[in-house]
């Protein structure tokens, strides 16, 4: 048994396995929503020194860089966050983290339910037992320009309606919009030392710009659907899927890189230069924003989907690239590495190997309801098909054969009878992740001479960072970490030149290298690095076309090794 005793072990939620719900469905359930709001109020009101408080749970991810819930202090620890980024443990560490939050939320909801004095008190108590953290499915987009996947209760409403303990309807201040520090943490620096509450999408005056944030989410939605689809279907190994470290042979974003950009959807305006990050745009401060938990709930859901699709693949060996509170630089990481500061009821550290079956912790997702009790193989086939349907490109523009072809390729079920072949075009960016001291974005946009606007942005590759005077030494130790990200181009190619084909078969040549190079040169792609400091000298950018095909009877595209990957030069213009 470990000698590191935890005062708040992660034991999971007892009883029946219950689903974490999409936030759009969750808010329609009055009992769930009321209990969630009340539980947040309870956690946010707790003294910031209480390990079960909203502040302390958020602080596990970053500042104030203190030990969490340890019975005895541990000596010689790095002054750093606990969270693992850029390593093979990124998905599993955050699974344990999300579940620790969920367990604490669930306990608070149970206490809240006991306060109801109405005749249906038993129903409130049962609802509290069934309550799980909801997720924001930011990868889903139904081809609706006004769809953002978040209800007003999460992003707009300063007051929300809930049921009071006596059964009447009341309005209360919305605890999902912000966390109010009491007091502001003394180790916060810069703007974070001035903001009394968490800040989303700050403008040049350092004020919250919610309508700008919503416009940014809408503009990014089609790209996120394609990024999510490619992340789930083209990363066959744990090394490719798990983190943003550069890997030979990658052709789609990792789970972590897509996750980075979602942080920035809430945490920064990409059109501002220099960058003005809010809390969600800075690693040391991100988990203090209540939306963090919805975001990371979806990160875990995507991990569960990928696990089911690749049921014979799990955590592979990798190198720890930066110091954390629980890991040293250069340490070899495996599925048996401890996930500090999370301990079992037996006071042993949780390990990735313990977390492979997420139901161990008392939750699941609605996506798996149709295949309960099925074999791993049957679940894999079903989820593969479901991912194609849910995240594959869908279009109502049936007059555009190039988009119909793209839709056919991405939405084919495993029993399809046609073999599809298509070049997949991406912008590929590699860079030293710690070259700059804080978060930064690499932004790609059309019509370079016209300037960068939300409407012209094709996509971004984002370094989700955050440096303080206390942890800057970690960056020096991690200088050699090369990260990579991708921006997928086929949707834009299909939209713009697809009208030149009469049928889907005629559209295939439109994705061939010669036509694509001609098209992209005309679109004048600009690239700019937006940060709060200097130039990113390590950045290397290229456009790559990989020949993929979808065999008859399969739902996962395969790289055609008989054809070379094509590199297009002299297309992207670097803008200072």
From Swiss-Prot:
Give binding positions for Cu cation 1.
61, 85, 94
Q: According to the lineage, what is the superkingdom?
A: Eukaryota
Q: Where is this cross-link: 2'-(S-cysteinyl)-histidine (Cys-His)?
A: 83-85
Q: Per the record, what are the reactions this protein catalyses?
A: 2 L-dopa + O2 = 2 L-dopaquinone + 2 H2O; L-tyrosine + O2 = L-dopaquinone + H2O
Swiss-Prot/TrEMBL site (Cleavage) positions: 392-393
Q: Which GO terms describe its molecular function?
A: metal ion binding; tyrosinase activity
Needed cofactors, names only, are: Cu(2+)
E.C. numbers = 1.14.18.1
The record lists Cu cation 2 as bound by 259, 263, 296
Give the pro-peptide residues: 393-576
Biological process (GO) annotations held by this record are: melanin biosynthetic process
Cofactor annotation remark:
Binds 2 copper ions per subunit.
Please name every pair of cysteines joined by a disulfide bond in this record.
none
What enzyme category does the UniProt record give?
oxidoreductase
**What task does this protein carry out?**
Copper-containing oxidase that catalyzes both the o-hydroxylation of monophenols and the subsequent oxidation of the resulting o-diphenols into reactive o-quinones, which evolve spontaneously to produce intermediates, which associate in dark brown pigments. Involved in the initial step of melanin synthesis. Melanins constitute a mechanism of defense and resistance to stress such as UV radiations, free radicals, gamma rays, dehydratation and extreme temperatures, and contribute to the fungal cell-wall resistance against hydrolytic enzymes in avoiding cellular lysis.
- How does the annotation summarize its subunit structure? Tetramer composed of two subunits of PPO3 (H subunits) and two subunits of the as yet uncharacterized product of ORF239342 (L subunits).
> What family is this?
Belongs to the tyrosinase family.
From the Swiss-Prot or TrEMBL record, give the protein name.
Answer: Polyphenol oxidase 3
